[in-house]
């Protein structure tokens, strides 16, 4: 295990590891314990009582955070004809069809999110081995395979985040930057928590939200009382 820096160790002393803080208190602590010299991202981590190995307990989707993430997302849209024009008008950073497939195969990745119209997925599917491991493959569950490219681009630019449970039952989601007002971080935090509660698989047994923590990029994790996220 990597040795923690002096600043991190000092910051961690401010957090009671045995306590579960309210969402508001946790956000305040995250700011106090942030040791980064840049505007660090604040990330929420949810440990869920699901078995991702079972198809009916896999959780994946997307939600628009009311105050965005603080990051400007570069959007690539695979579309042609009128849909390509709509994507450009909506503010997509890159719009094209097969020309971008060749660029990506050659190692071009100057984008953060990929959207594709359903009729383009036959071609985009060729990029599965490249985009899949990076979490960039368009998917209907996250609203990135759609003919409504205007809505898709607008939502991404407005602060839409994707969530997906990993093999251990965890979901990590950015909820903003340390420069955000406390109230905005809390509202974003509650929005993603509420979304995850709504998509709870009916097959999941026992406690659903087992543990929730929030932390800045280089700061210690702060445990959150789940009841304060309602």
UniProtKB/Swiss-Prot annotation:
HAMAP family: Ribosomal_uL1_B. The keyword Ribonucleoprotein applies. GO terms for cellular component: large ribosomal subunit. Transmembrane segments: none annotated. This is Large ribosomal subunit protein uL1. Belongs to the universal ribosomal protein uL1 family. InterPro entries: Ribosom_uL1_bac-type, Ribosomal_uL1, Ribosomal_uL1-like, Ribosomal_uL1/biogenesis, Ribosomal_uL1_3-a/b-sand, Ribosomal_uL1_CS. It comes from Bacillus cereus (strain G9842). Part of the 50S ribosomal subunit. The gene is rplA. Pfam families: Ribosomal_L1. GO terms for biological process: regulation of translation; translation. GO terms for molecular function: rRNA binding; structural constituent of ribosome; tRNA binding. PANTHER family: 54S RIBOSOMAL PROTEIN L1, MITOCHONDRIAL, LARGE RIBOSOMAL SUBUNIT PROTEIN UL1M. Gene3D superfamilies: 3.30.190.20, 3.40.50.790. The lineage of its organism: Bacteria, Bacillati, Bacillota, Bacilli, Bacillales.
